């Protein structure tokens, strides 16, 4: 992942709440209830981030989640309307296989992974969720997979070759 932090105030970010759960802490006097929110933010132009927030009230949890997501933004390369190459993201028990698709295919992905890909700015991409359907693990696996993406120019530079040599 990139070391430099991305300034969220420069971007026009859209946010999407993926998951809200009521969580419980059992104490001597009974149970303490709080709400946990999983939020994805993105500018639909190559920037996407995920965050989680927890609070006594749902709106506060969502607000905290948005703040957290803005701190965890990553930049993803978009080639045309799709991903540059196939990749697998892993987080916990969640595996997400992200594959390029032809123009006009649309976003073929299930549940929270679809939201991540939409907010990242992809128009044509296929994804398969494997291992778990826990929203947090799926979203983080998708972010992990997207953070591994590299353009052909970057790969060529790392290998010390020209793009023509790389692509044959």
Swiss-Prot record:
InterPro entries attached to this UniProt entry: Ribosomal_Su5_D2-typ_SF (IPR020568), Ribosomal_uS5 (IPR000851), Ribosomal_uS5_bac-type (IPR005712), Ribosomal_uS5_C (IPR005324), Ribosomal_uS5_N (IPR013810), Ribosomal_uS5_N_CS (IPR018192), Ribsml_uS5_D2-typ_fold_subgr (IPR014721)
Domain annotation S5 DRBM: ranges: 13-76
Listed transmembrane segments: none
The UniProt record lists the keyword Ribosomal protein: yes
GO terms for cellular component: small ribosomal subunit
GO biological process, one term: translation
NCBIfam families: rpsE_bact
Function: With S4 and S12 plays an important role in translational accuracy. Located at the back of the 30S subunit body where it stabilizes the conformation of the head with respect to the body.
Domain text: The N-terminal domain interacts with the head of the 30S subunit; the C-terminal domain interacts with the body and contacts protein S4. The interaction surface between S4 and S5 is involved in control of translational fidelity.
Name of protein: Small ribosomal subunit protein uS5
GN (gene name): rpsE
């Amino acid at each position: 992942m990139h070391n430099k932090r991305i300034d969220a105030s420069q971007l026009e970010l859209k946010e999407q709440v993926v998951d809200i759960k009521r969580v419980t802490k059992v104490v001597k006097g009974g149970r303490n209830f709080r709400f946990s929110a999983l939020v994805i933010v993105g500018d639909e132009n190559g920037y996407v981030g995920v965050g989680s927030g927890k609070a006594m009230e749902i709106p506060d949890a969502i607000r905290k989640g948005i703040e957290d997501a803005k701190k965890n933004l990553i930049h993803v390369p978009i080639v045309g309307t799709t991903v540059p190459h196939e990749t697998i993201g892993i987080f916990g028990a969640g595996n997400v296989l992200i594959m390029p698709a032809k123009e006009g295919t649309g976003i073929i992905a299930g549940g929270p992974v679809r939201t991540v890909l939409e907010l990242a700015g992809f128009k044509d991409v296929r994804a398969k969720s494997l291992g778990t359907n826990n929203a947090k693990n799926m979203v983080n696996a998708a972010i992990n997979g997207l953070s591994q993406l590299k353009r052909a120019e970057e790969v060529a530079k790392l290998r010390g070759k020209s793009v023509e040599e790389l692509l044959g």
